[in-house]
Amino acid sequence: MLGPIAMMQIAPEQGAFLTTLARIMNAKSAVEVGTFTGYSAISIARGLAPGGKLLCCDVSEEWTKIACDFWERAGVADRIRLEIRPATETLRALPEGETIDFAFIDADKVNYRTYYEEILARLRPNGLIVFDNVLWGGSVVDESNQKEDTIAIRALNDFVASDPRVECVMVPIADGLLLTRKRAAGEVR
């Protein structure tokens, strides 16, 4: 159905992992940046606590129409709100304060850092931000690769690893997930 662009979709094992993480977190408020055809959103929505809601941020009406159909078919559409506009606008319009439990970022790589900062400012202590594609096909370790997306992911990985506000671990599932937990105030490193 999707052809070669289907590679933009998360892998099934990543979907199962996102569902499990959302359940472990008892997430009631989740954000996804980059929705594509909605598989990752289904995975997160299935793991939400009763009454939980997922805000999906995307710019493509074409792909999110497919997502909306899949959400209906999966029985999770009532848990998802979709915003079609640049994610930075959607995130900056969210209320200040620690209201987000869980976030998944899988969108334009050059803006990962911006999305990180906007979500982190609204993430509860011990909340989780998960980034996709952090291995980027192995190209992040090849310093000769100076493509814009590769540089952005490499910089994000380095920044988050040294950010004292969080602790993180890279998980080599599919193209790599970076799990980033917000530290509680006064938490000892």
Predicted regions and their residues:
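S-adenosylmethionine/decaboxylated-SAM
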Residues: P4-R189
